[in-house]
Curated annotation (Swiss-Prot):
Pathway: Amino-acid biosynthesis; L-histidine biosynthesis; L-histidine from 5-phospho-alpha-D-ribose 1-diphosphate: step 5/9. SUPFAM superfamilies: Ribulose-phoshate binding barrel. GO terms for molecular function: imidazoleglycerol-phosphate synthase activity; lyase activity. One of its GO terms (biological process) is L-histidine biosynthetic process. It holds the Pfam family His_biosynth. It comes from Enterobacter sp. (strain 638). It is an enzyme of class 4 (lyase). It comes from the Bacteria. This is Imidazole glycerol phosphate synthase subunit HisF. GO terms for cellular component: cytoplasm. The active site is at D11, D130. Gene3D superfamilies: Aldolase class I.
Amino acid sequence: MLAKRIIPCLDVRDGQVVKGVQFRNHEIIGDIVPLAKRYAEEGADELVFYDITASSDGRVVDKSWVARVAEVIDIPFCVAGGIKSAEDAAKILSFGADKISINSPALADPELITRLADRFGVQCIVVGIDTWFDDATGKYHVNQYTGDESRTRVTQWETLDWVQEVQKRGAGEIVLNMMNQDGVRNGYDLEQLKKVRAVCRVPMIASGGAGTMEHFLEAFRDADVDGALAASVFHKQIINIGELKTYLATQGVEIRLC
């Protein structure tokens, strides 16, 4: 059995790490490199960096900090932000990233997933999915350009359909960003995770809602996710990664201890 992964998420805007609630009202957390170094030292299994306004601004992630992060950590990390071509991806990987993640650009050009997977291998290609539960329709819908609330829009895709589509096109991993739960620390949306797990054959990462160690346990035990991503509980030092992993191990979760 593969070990479950604990993944701190660092949302980047204007060269700094920020954090919002339900993808809105972002506050500055701190500088990118020191936070990355801290999480690696605490025992994170990997890191994910999202340049949250790159796609909506029509630009690619700032590669200068990617190289600086690669110099100070010895764990895998994934970078997302405005990657629209194999050339964009190649540059980010050449600066030291282990994976690249695409989200809004994949919705605009689904064939991009296949082009990237063919060139770099599926193990390198992560697709992020920003999913919102609509009370009016009772369905989960995929959103686009969520890094800028003034430009965020609901797409024509229902979440389960898009999950299946990106797998067909070559996604090697899926990060499910559950927008309703983001930043509120009330737990992951287990119902949605179970539905997605039923149709997801590639590694699946839960994102949005972690507030306690028990929330991580529930995601692993009840929804069988491969990794749990979180931000505010780590940024604000509500949960220590080493202590979290020790707790999960005592609960029978296969985890890499620090």
